[in-house]
């Protein structure tokens, strides 16, 4: 009878332990993005007050007024190129990029949701991706239209200039976006696409 009692007890406890484990996992995932909109709003305010970041107003916003902190992207220049021209809205570009969310407990450097290269960036080894300048979120497009060939920027984009309240695969709604962008080259409609392999800046 004692053996039967222990068997019955084990059958009762094991499912409960599984439920506790599952609940703990769910709670952890939920906590990762708890108060997500408020946290992202607070980060934008920090960017806005950081004098080390260059403020560039989004091309879609009224350029004659000051606007709000959500109307701007905030740029840290990692490398300055030698180019003097910038891509137009209708141009195509060769870029390398890495996109992250704001830091969280599990991802202190920010969760990487997309990237065209792995490891440390190198002009010689990074894979370049072709985009149409105007086909991206407005914050990314704004950055490209201010960059020159050879520039590498870290661009902080408020969610208002990203995907807004919408979720995109691994990007929750109300997510600010942080992109490392390297602009190798660009060309106008009708021009021959330049090659990028083995090129040096």
What is each stretch, according to the model?
Residues 7-15:
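Sec-dependent N-terminal signal peptides
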Residues 2-6, 23-201:
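Cross-family detector of peptidyl-prolyl cis-trans isomerase
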């Amino acid at each position: 009878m004692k053996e039967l009692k222990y068997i019955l007890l084990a059958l009762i406890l094991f499912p409960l332990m599984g439920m506790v484990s599952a609940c703990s996992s769910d709670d952890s995932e939920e906590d990762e993005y708890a108060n997500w909109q408020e946290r992202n709003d607070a980060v934008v305010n920090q960017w806005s007050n950081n004098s080390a970041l260059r403020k560039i107003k989004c091309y879609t916003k009224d350029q004659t007024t000051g606007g709000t902190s959500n109307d701007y992207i905030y740029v840290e220049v990692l490398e300055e190129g030698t180019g003097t021209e910038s891509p137009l809205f209708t141009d195509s570009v060769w870029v390398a990029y890495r996109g992250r969310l704001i830091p969280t407990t599990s991802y202190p450097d920010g969760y990487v949701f997309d990237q065209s290269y792995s490891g440390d960036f190198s002009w010689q080894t990074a894979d370049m991706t072709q985009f149409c300048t105007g086909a991206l979120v407005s914050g990314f497009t704004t950055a490209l239209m201010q960059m020159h060939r050879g520039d590498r920027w870290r661009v902080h984009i408020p969610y208002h200039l990203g995907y807004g309240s919408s979720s995109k695969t691994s990007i929750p709604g109300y997510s600010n976006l942080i992109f490392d962008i390297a602009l190798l080259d660009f060309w106008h409609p009708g021009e021959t696409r330049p090659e990028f392999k083995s090129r040096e800046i």
